[in-house]
Amino acid sequence: MPFQTPPPVSAPVPSISAPAAVIGAPVRAQYGWGYAGPDGEGVGTLSLLMEAASGRLVIELHAPGERLLLLEGDSASGYRLQVPRQKVDQRAPYLAQLPLPFLPQVLSVEGLLHLLRTGEGAGVSVQKKDAQGPLKLHWRGKDPRGKDEQVWLDRKRWEEGE
């Protein structure tokens, strides 16, 4: 019988709410999105592709007729954030170094997955749940200027696996 070596101490701890078979597998999700803040209000669609194992992340936020935000990258090559309306085009080696306009701030892809799977995060409340987890989320926080803003997410699609 071959010996198994334990995982390195730095290995991420799997989420309790995620089945063991899908830890690290890609997660595709889509949410209805609503926003209220100092610069106005808006609605749209938030689409995400998340891979915790590689740190790969693609986020697209669309309002009717325009893309508000595109964030893509992975933990090996870094992340790029584009916000055309605000003329933002930023790169950073770590997700935590990028401001996420119109969304709650997260430190990592694992943190974003945890927030969406459990509804746990600073300023986040779960308004409705189903068997898969939070169906409707509400976030209340501050923008980079210290002004109040709110985001509502209504899950439309959640797919785990290849």
How should each PLM-predicted stretch be described?
Residues 1-47, 158-161:
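N-terminal leader/targeting segments and the immediate start of mature chains
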Residues 16, 24-26, 49, 94-104, ...:
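Polar alpha-helical coiled-coil and adjacent low-complexity
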Residues 27-33, 42-50, 55-61, 77-79, ...:
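One face of beta-strands
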Residues 32-38, 64-66, 84-87, 144:
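Hydrophobic lipid-interacting interfaces of membrane-associated proteins
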Residues 35-41, 58-64, 113-120:
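Short, solvent-exposed secondary-structure boundary motifs
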Residues 47-51, 71-72, 123-130:
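Short, exposed beta-strand/loop patches in secreted or surface proteins that constitute
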Residues 54-107:
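An acidic-aromatic
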Residues 113-162:
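Gly/Pro-enriched, hydrophobic low-complexity segments
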